């Protein structure tokens, strides 16, 4: 009985300094506990936001990766070889597919002989020079077309050109930027162009006109030229 009375007395005694009851200590403890719980809740919310953002970025990357590639340009199989023309900035070794050029009878003979010893020399050297001659003849128009297709080339002031043979009608392999054969520059072409022309004929007879890889762009070019002629 005495013990219980002494305990009751202790719980009701005021503090010496403040005059408050000991329940203040319980209130402080409750306030500290609520602050800790709020901090933990805020941390958990931040973690949830981070997880949601990470999942969102991953989903966007997956959608970009699953984007369907552009359709392959259709080419007629008339027995003549086709070559994909590439362009790059002179100071950056990164090729961009530009157009397709069809070869004539002379080009067909060169391609047929490319697997023997003499044909390798003719194929790598003479075909390259003939294609380069066709390109440099209309280089300004070719550069305009290239800048429209690849905006990254707008800042370039000097270009290099290359080509790949379309083998077995495989356009996808021909459009890849690996194993592109670089064409000689205009200065290099002038040194031996006359000899090549005398032996193999004019480059214009060996190769047809350049065709754009984007369908409909040739029609737009022709319409523009007609409008300029009428004006």
Curated annotation (Swiss-Prot):
<dbReference type="GO" id="GO:0009507">
    <property type="term" value="C:chloroplast"/>
</dbReference>
<keyword id="KW-1133">Transmembrane helix</keyword>
<comment type="subunit">
    <text>Interacts with psbB, psbC and LQY1, but not with psbA or psbD.</text>
</comment>
<feature type="compositionally biased region" description="Basic and acidic residues">
    <location>
        <begin position="217"/>
        <end position="231"/>
    </location>
</feature>
<dbReference type="GO" id="GO:0003729">
    <property type="term" value="F:mRNA binding"/>
</dbReference>
<keyword id="KW-0150">Chloroplast</keyword>
<dbReference type="Pfam" id="PF20133">
    <property type="entry name" value="HHL1-like"/>
</dbReference>
<feature type="transit peptide" description="Chloroplast">
    <location>
        <begin position="1"/>
        <end position="39"/>
    </location>
</feature>
<keyword id="KW-0812">Transmembrane</keyword>
<keyword id="KW-0472">Membrane</keyword>
<protein>
    <recommendedName>
        <fullName>Protein HHL1, chloroplastic</fullName>
    </recommendedName>
</protein>
<feature type="transmembrane region" description="Helical">
    <location>
        <begin position="93"/>
        <end position="113"/>
    </location>
</feature>
<feature type="region of interest" description="Disordered">
    <location>
        <begin position="206"/>
        <end position="231"/>
    </location>
</feature>
<dbReference type="InterPro" id="IPR045388">
    <property type="entry name" value="HHL1-like"/>
</dbReference>
<dbReference type="GO" id="GO:0009535">
    <property type="term" value="C:chloroplast thylakoid membrane"/>
</dbReference>
<keyword id="KW-0934">Plastid</keyword>
<dbReference type="GO" id="GO:0005739">
    <property type="term" value="C:mitochondrion"/>
</dbReference>
<keyword id="KW-0809">Transit peptide</keyword>
<dbReference type="GO" id="GO:0009534">
    <property type="term" value="C:chloroplast thylakoid"/>
</dbReference>
<comment type="function">
    <text>Involved in photoprotection. Forms a complex with LQY1 that is involved in the repair and reassembly cycle of the PSII-LHCII supercomplex under high-light conditions. May function in guiding the release of psbC from PSII core monomers.</text>
</comment>
<dbReference type="GO" id="GO:0009941">
    <property type="term" value="C:chloroplast envelope"/>
</dbReference>
<keyword id="KW-0793">Thylakoid</keyword>
